[in-house]
Amino acid sequence: MHPDVSADLAELDATLKTVESVLDIEELRRRIDELEHQAADPDLWNDQDHAQRVTSELSHAQGELRRVEDLRRRLEDLPVLYELAEGEEGEARTAALEEADAERAALHSDVEAMEVRTLLSGEYDKREALVNIRSGAGGVDAADWAEMLMRMYIRWADRHGYPVEVYDTSYAEEAGIKSATFAVKTPYAYGTLSVEMGTHRLVRISPFDNQGRRQTSFAEVEVLPVVETTDHIEVPETEIRVDVYRSSGPGGQSVNTTDSAVRITHIPTGIVVTCQNEKSQLQNKISAMRVLQAKLLERKRQEERAEMDALKTNEGASWGNQMRSYVLHPYQMVKDLRTNYEVNNPSAVLNGDIDGFIESGIRWRMRESQAS
């Protein structure tokens, strides 16, 4: 085996050992055994929220273990591939070496992706995520763009097998949505998706413009950690106003004959949340309260960061203003304005292929944190 290949495999092995150490594989196996025991309990589903947390954590832990074990197996197979290739002659040798090199490159990419997971060590990174998307400047194009972003994130979750629960969708009059709120219900969803916070910009020929002019649209993405009991986010009934109304669909059309949709106003802060996607008023109120608690937790975190001078002007601009540009005309490119990571296939990105952006964003966040 060529010395450069041997050195590269040694580097891969060292990186993978770091990943295995950070994830604590033996502890992961122990936790899986514990969760499997809980999942087998016939009384588990007496508490549906707890049951969903158990099954979600179990599925995530099993997936993590499978990924690491698969990476280790592939790394152990690589020297064999090179040995077999070097035993060939002529064109067969060339083809076999190219195959081994391709697998080594693919393994590099997969190990680096797994390494990114070890960077999620923030206080709330392990939580499930609440994602809020709001249309911005750009009229009907912005509403359509907000719906495209919602579809992008849901397809990303589907690619990974992450459950998604849509809490609320406020449809625009002509097309698209004014806003939407949904939960990505898997461990580390918040740590992963929080790098997507900010303003997303779309440039394209407007399908709603009879003259076929180019239009720039904006939509805002907010990502919040799901609140847990340990956060002690109490919301007294005296601090909220609850309004009920009929659920509506595209174009404002009523889709329910009963007042099942719920709007909750938090009187001290003025925060308003709505939920209309559940079947009953009670279910919608429970979901809306979860969103309100998440927003209050984020408000509390912002106040704490402000006190610690963590929300400096440069960081605030990074997250609050444009963070990614999607250009469909006159050329095709999606570019992250913080990391400079870019791809020339917007169609794939809008269909949920955003792992490259997320991974580069997590690394960027780590560098920014270390520099501050």
UniProtKB/Swiss-Prot annotation:
Post-translation changes: Methylated by PrmC. Methylation increases the termination efficiency of RF2.
Primary location group: cytoplasm
Pfam families hit by this protein: PCRF, RF-1
Protein localization: Cytoplasm
Family annotation (Gene3D superfamilies): 3.30.160.20, 3.30.70.1660, Release factor
Gene Ontology cellular component terms for the protein in this record: cytoplasm
UniProt keyword list: Cytoplasm, Methylation, Protein biosynthesis
GO MF, one example: translation release factor activity, codon specific
UniProt xrefs under InterPro entries: PCRF, Pep_chain_release_fac_I, Pep_chain_release_fac_I_sf, PrfB
Positions of post-translational N5-methylglutamine modification: 253
Coiled coil residues, start to end: none
PANTHER family: CLASS I PEPTIDE CHAIN RELEASE FACTOR, PEPTIDE CHAIN RELEASE FACTOR 2
UniProt-listed NCBIfam families: prfB
Record family assignment: Belongs to the prokaryotic/mitochondrial release factor family.
Known function: Peptide chain release factor 2 directs the termination of translation in response to the peptide chain termination codons UGA and UAA.
Protein name: Peptide chain release factor 2
